[in-house]
């Protein structure tokens, strides 16, 4: 059985890894959709699809997990979004998502939809991790070591800090 899991992975963290490890015990292959792949260089979505792909693939090299990582665009036309996903991915029968809109869209197309149990959401939240990066708090323990290396390689912390700068001093 092949399943589809979509996320923004901004950044890929240990909570994401635990969800993928758990799903991998239930299915033969996982299609990891890199959602909102067209978005980058914002405080909410600081990393490019390629950078997120590196985070995921370098991390999962250490695990016996069969997967495809595929960039998925937002198309802002919900009625045809599932068809767009289907055109970009290998066939799948099950969708794992915690997003109510994604759950609804795939349910309407008769997919089996499962809500994965979040892993320690108090600590493992992309929003909280990005905030820690911005304010100089320790964040490295919340992501796999390979993700730390990717973020260092692309100077991701300084990118986030530059994105947070005001364009002009307020008088």
UniProtKB/Swiss-Prot annotation:
It comes from the Archaea. It catalyses: beta-nicotinamide D-ribonucleotide + ATP + H(+) = diphosphate + NAD(+). Keywords: ATP-binding, Cytoplasm, NAD, Nucleotide-binding, Nucleotidyltransferase, Pyridine nucleotide biosynthesis, Transferase. One of its GO terms (molecular function) is nicotinamide-nucleotide adenylyltransferase activity. CDD domains: NMNAT_Archaea (cd02166). One of its GO terms (biological process) is NAD biosynthetic process. It is found in: Cytoplasm. It is an enzyme of class 2 (transferase). One of its GO terms (cellular component) is cytoplasm. Pathway: Cofactor biosynthesis; NAD(+) biosynthesis; NAD(+) from nicotinamide D-ribonucleotide: step 1/1. Its EC number is 2.7.7.1. PANTHER family: BIFUNCTIONAL NMN ADENYLYLTRANSFERASE_NUDIX HYDROLASE (PTHR21342:SF0), PHOSPHOPANTETHEINE ADENYLYLTRANSFERASE (PTHR21342). This is Nicotinamide-nucleotide adenylyltransferase. It comes from Methanococcus maripaludis (strain C5 / ATCC BAA-1333).
